[in-house]
Amino acid sequence: MPEIEPIIAIAREVLVGRSPLAREDTFLFDHSLRVMHVADRLSRCEEAASWRIDRFALSVAALFHQAATVRLDEERRTSTVYAAATMSAEDVKHYSAELAGDRLRGQVPARQLELVQEIIRRAHDATAELAEAKILSDADSLDDIGALGVWRDLRRYCLEGRAIDEAVHAWERREEYGYWEARLRDVFYLETSRRLAEARVASARAFMHQLGRERAGDDIPAE
């Protein structure tokens, strides 16, 4: 089996773009590394013990599951006409799988590379039967929930120059229409993942509640 370190180095070349401050933007690369590590941990949980899993292919797919994003973001910034404007999430998955194939040909055995591409294409597919695709989906969803999810949202709000009020109100709207309950119910394949997500949502809820209190000064004792 090939070593994962050279693949990580290739992924870094693909996933690191330029930030609005013209610095290296490692956001997507860091996300993909986290997803890779969580996917590996989930693949070893008791629920998945009977599944046949190619852990190397799973790790590579986790690294490249959003490989198209950096290129699409560059197109948005530099081109007046670009396909990214009309690309669906499904399109992005297929584009990412193509990029993985292009960049890893000769680095990963052909049959394993085909599996990597199929894992990427079938991720977040409710009808997926591929074990690795289920695990990748759960790991990716977990990275969008809890403290990491709050950090991702606040990062976006800061980059867009938006106020704390908007972040707090967006969270409150999600709570009002049961957004988290629906996600916990619908997006996870493994009960292990669902339990982790429940704990993460609870921690995020506590943080956002405190953020809202501090924003309004409600944590200051009455005289």
Residue ranges and their predicted role:
Residues 1-17, 67-68, 72:
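Short alpha-helical hairpin
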Residues 8-36, 76-87, 188-192:
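Active-site flanking loop/helix segments enriched in acidic
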Residues 18-22, 42-46, 70, 103, ...:
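Alpha-helix C-capping/helix-to-loop hinge sites
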Residues 21-23, 98, 102-113:
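Active-site-proximal helix-loop elements at catalytic-domain edges
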Residues 23-33, 37-52, 64, 125-223:
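Divalent metal-dependent phosphate-bond-processing catalytic cores, especially two-metal-ion Mg2+/Mn2+ enzymes
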Residues 35-36, 40, 89-105:
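An active-site-proximal "capping" alpha-helix that borders the catalytic cofactor pocket
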Residues 47-60, 105-120, 132:
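Acidic/histidine metal-binding catalytic segments
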Residues 53-81, 96, 117-126:
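His-Asp-centered metal-binding catalytic motifs of divalent-metal-dependent phosphohydrolases/nucleases
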